[in-house]
Amino acid sequence: MIPIRIVACTRHNRKDFAETPLGVTIQRFSHLSFIEAQLFTNNTVGLCQRYNEAIEAAKNDPALLVFVHDDVEIVDWYWYMRLGASLDDHHLVGLAGNCQPSPGQTSWAITDMEGTLSDRQSWAGCVARGNGEYLTSWDVFASPNREVSLIDGLFMAAYSKTFHDNDLRFDEQFTFHHYDMDLCRQFTEKGLSIYVSSISAIHHSQGLMGPAWKESAQRYLDKWQGL
């Protein structure tokens, strides 16, 4: 059985990482031998560099790679089964996304630099919000289990073979923002399908749209010319 390998970057050391939402998740499923973790602790470089290192390492050790932020807690006892079923017919899986993004969107859910939300009818999936300890609210976007064009990078999963067979990698010019949208565009260019699965999770964070985000958004728009 091919392993499920959770790939995560964190600024925490290994001991403190265990107390993060993702650290708690990994411990919660530690009894399942086919679920592994590849951790980049005390990390000071961009996510894409580390994610690409994980993809490269999987050439000789194939896996179902799950790229997850350290502030995400998976609260679904059957998430690995849902994920496997979703990847039977699709190539990239997430928890929230957009079926019909407008040209020039700066996020899967945002249309411009000012944070204007796109048409909710094109959204898919559901992610809960938390404060680091408790669930505080639900972001109910729309029904999951549907194909989309863009997904949120808080959780992205694909088989390592898909990356290798299609010469796909994360673009390292995107260190933290917009790498998710960029990867989705790459998958679409290759004719590969993207899917939002019904996996329950809590995101213990709030999104920020500061100067670094806007600079990254402009790089993304320049690369994809308004797609």
Segments predicted by a language model, with ranges:
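C-terminal catalytic/acceptor-binding lobe
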Residues: 150, 170-227
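Glycine-rich, basic loop-to-helix element that forms the pyrophosphate-binding segment
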Residues: 44-58
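A recurrent flexible, glycine/aromatic-enriched loop bordering the glycosyltransferase active site
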Residues: 122-158
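Short, acidic/glycine-rich phosphate-metal binding loop used to engage nucleotide
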Residues: 40-47, 73
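N-proximal low-complexity "stem/linker" segments adjacent to membrane-targeting elements
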Residues: 1-28, 34, 38
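Short beta-strand-to-loop acidic/aromatic patch adjacent to the donor-nucleotide binding site
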Residues: 62-73
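Short glycine/serine/threonine-enriched helix-capping/active-site loop
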Residues: 9, 93-98, 197-199, 204
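Conserved donor NDP-sugar-binding/catalytic core segment of glycosyltransferases
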Residues: 73, 77-121
